[in-house]
Amino acid sequence: MKDLFLFSDLIYHNHLFVYAFHFCLVAIIVVLVAKLATSKMQLVPRGLQNIVEAYLEGVISMGRDTLGSEALARKYLPLVATIGFVVFFSNAIGIIPGFESPTSSLNLTLTLALIVFFYYHFEGIKKNGFFKYFGHFMGPSKALAPLMFPVEIISHLSRIVSLSFRLFGNIKGDDLFLLVMLTLAPWFAPLPAYALLTLMAVLQTFIFMMLTYVYLAGAVAIEEH
């Protein structure tokens, strides 16, 4: 958003630097939140510890409902919770004037999508074995294998596009919406828009986390079918 002031431009004015700078800022925020929440842990959680614990319990509950197993939900908690933190703060930081959302760059959303893609395939192969895992792609009948296998491959590859472009498109659209609102009425119009953009930041985070659990569930639950 070239028409808006960005703090990163005070250091270096470059399109790629803007997103790299803000992603590093998000990474620092995530580390600080984790550090502050665990530095003085109490039996009865308060403050930031209480918020983070509630968030983690929510992630576990989401995983338990999706995977059907609390053990698996806790196993994948570090991945899903970290992705949730990164995506949320990346979405939310762009709402603050002078900052840009790292998730409005396809570079970050595609990277996150590829991490999820390769990890759930890795977990599927690890649990079921290489041949059994990819044999599932061929469908229930050998006669349908020549048709089902390429369809399944395309279906899985499309998940990369779905994960990355959904997040990128929504956040980029939010940034452009905010730009228009700030241009038309910089003092009054953005106030209700900020509430809407915050809601969208939370919603897109939830969708990305939920889909991560769904893809993991499909990969590790093959032997149960």
UniProtKB/Swiss-Prot annotation:
Q: Which GO terms describe its molecular function?
A: proton-transporting ATP synthase activity, rotational mechanism
Its domain of life reads Bacteria
Keyword line: ATP synthesis, Cell inner membrane, Cell membrane, CF(0), Hydrogen ion transport, Ion transport, Membrane, Transmembrane, Transmembrane helix, Transport
Q: Which InterPro entries does the protein's record reference?
A: ATP_syn_F0_a_bact/chloroplast (IPR045082), ATP_synth_F0_asu (IPR000568), ATP_synth_F0_asu_AS (IPR023011), F0_ATP_A_sf (IPR035908)
Stated membrane topology is:
Multi-pass membrane protein
Gene3D superfamilies recorded: ATP synthase, F0 complex, subunit A
List membrane-spanning regions.
16-36, 79-99, 105-125, 176-196, 202-222
Picking any one GO biological process from the record gives: proton motive force-driven plasma membrane ATP synthesis
Family stated for the protein in its record:
Belongs to the ATPase A chain family.
What is this protein's name? ATP synthase subunit a
Question: Which organism's genome codes for this protein?
Answer: Campylobacter curvus (strain 525.92)
